[in-house]
Amino acid sequence: MVNALVKSYNFVLNWMAVFAGILIFLSFVMIVVDVTMRIVGLKPPLFTIAVVEYILLWFAMLAAPWLLRIKGHVFIDAVTQFLPKLVKTVIAKIVYSICIVSSSIYCFHAAGLLREAWVKEMVDVRSIDMPLWILYAPMPFCFFFVATEFARYLVGVDDMYSQTILEREGV
């Protein structure tokens, strides 16, 4: 049962990263098409800027848990690298706890924003009208996944500081 849950979680996490990659590629294509159309004197689609802005938010949210899993995010260990192992472990557990709490708070508030935008049928008015809930849709789920990844670190499934600085250089 637990093994199936872990496999499902990993599957979703990896597909979130794949979807983030697809989205960033689509935004690249949209920008190239928009600029090319402008250069050749055609009128580009009005929705490009608004959709690319949405894609950037979705990309950041969908990629965050996966980047945390592979330790590809930015973290500063300039001080902790010189500390004794026990002190480093205690500091790491405190940092993980703070990150779990903050991600959970963001998850809760993002869920409230998503619910409010859905219930009130709010619309984001830009070059195109788009339901506002689309903007908030990935936030609660992705912050939940981020909190879960930090919980993995907290309980010892993995450790954010298990790699040396030189090992992280390639990430």
Describe each PLM feature range.
Residues 1-171:
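Alpha-helical transmembrane segments and membrane-interface helix-loop junctions
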